[in-house]
Swiss-Prot record:
Binding site for S-adenosyl-L-methionine: 73, 104, 123-128
One Pfam assignment: SPOUT_MTase
Function: Specifically methylates the pseudouridine at position 1915 (m3Psi1915) in 23S rRNA.
CDD domains xref list: RlmH-like
InterPro entries (UniProt xref): Alpha/beta_knot_MTases, RlmH-like, tRNA_m1G_MTases_N
Entry keyword set: Cytoplasm, Methyltransferase, rRNA processing, S-adenosyl-L-methionine, Transferase
Protein name: Ribosomal RNA large subunit methyltransferase H
Lineage top rank: taxon: Bacteria
Family stated for the protein in its record: Belongs to the RNA methyltransferase RlmH family.
Coiled-coil residues: none
Taxonomic source organism: Xanthomonas oryzae pv. oryzae (strain KACC10331 / KXO85)
Listed PANTHER family: METHYLTRANSFERASE (PTHR33603), RIBOSOMAL RNA LARGE SUBUNIT METHYLTRANSFERASE H (PTHR33603:SF1)
Length: 156
């Protein structure tokens, strides 16, 4: 199973990119992780935020791998502990399809993106910079894969 993390937003600062690359490298033993950056919609004075979100949504949907199992990261989604994420990863692997994880823009995902998702995952009620979410997701995917492989990384 390959995983494509589709994230709406600008290019990440170097410290985020370095952290993401580190977990991407570690995770490659168990699951290739690809980052696809989606250009954010135009926002600002006199601009319609919903139109920007819908534009982003169209670009996200176009970036989905064919027949992928789609999981949208969304605040009202299902919260998962690290152990529960490992169980979900095992389930996703059992689907026999690639995985697409979606990180939305400032207003979240468009209705079309949420409709396309097989499930939604909440990493918690905190408001986090979307760049940081990329790094958190990469680390948690690595942690879940390490747990499934009985690797000593996870010590809870």
């Amino acid at each position: 199973m390959k995983c494509r993390l589709i994230a709406t937003g600008e290019r990440a600062p170097s410290w985020v990119a370095q952290g993401f690359a580190e977990y991407q490298k570690r995770l490659s033993h168990w699951m290739p992780l690809e980052l696809v950056e989606i250009e954010p919609g135009l926002r600002g004075k006199g601009r319609d935020a919903q139109r920007a979100t819908d534009d982003e949504g169209r670009r996200v949907l176009a970036a989905l791998p064919k027949n992928a199992y789609v999981v949208a990261l969304d605040v009202p989604g299902r919260p998962l502990s690290s152990e529960q994420l490992a169980q979900r990863m095992e389930h996703w692997r059992g689907q026999g399809r690639d995985l697409a994880l979606l990180i939305g823009g400032p207003e979240g995902h468009s209705a079309e993106v949420l409709k396309s998702a097989s499930e939604s995952w909440s990493i918690g009620p905190l408001t986090l910079p979307h760049m940081l979410v990329r790094l958190i997701v990469a680390e948690q995917l690595y942690r879940a894969a390490a747990m499934l492989a009985n690797h000593p990384y996870h010590r809870a």
